[in-house]
Amino acid sequence: MTLRPFLVTGVDFVSVPTRDLSVTIEFYEKTLGLERSALWQRPGDEPMGAEFETGTVTIAVMAVDRLGIPFQPHRVPIAFHVDDVAAARATLEASGVRFRGETIDSGVCHQALFEDPDGNLLDLHHRYAPKAERPDAAAT
């Protein structure tokens, strides 16, 4: 078997669909505190998307109807790193964000699931166990 050269060298952005771009921009910018780095807009047209920086990957919110794509919220969460899940959760709850269940302690990390205004599943995440100490590290 001949191996092909690895064509993919990284992840440029993760797309998040939205039905209401202005509401979604406000949520990611003001509620989550992410830095907006771009607004996608053709001259004379309505905006069709925006990008937010997380420090490791860009989140691109897209008005999918403007791209001819039917809206479907993400049901697999995007995990946002935070230093303290409990503190970040309390801050978001004080802003009106509703969480799905209690904070999870997996033995490796803490995480808390919530949704953006369009129902896209998001996750506050903090890994407290170094990867070498993970229970499944020997199996991988």
Language model: regions and residue ranges:
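N-terminal beta-strand motif that seeds the catalytic metal site of vicinal oxygen chelate
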Residues: 1-25, 76-78, 128-140
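Exposed loop/turn and edge beta-strand positions of beta-sandwich/beta-sheet ligand-binding modules
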Residues: 46-48, 74, 108
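Short beta->alpha transition motifs characteristic of CBS
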Residues: 38, 105, 124-131
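Conserved beta-strand in the GNAT
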Residues: 60-62, 113, 123-125
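Core segments of cupin and vicinal oxygen chelate
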Residues: 6-9, 15-58
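Vicinal oxygen chelate
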Residues: 18-22, 78-121
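Active-site beta-strand termini and strand-to-loop segments that position acidic
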Residues: 51-55, 114-117, 127
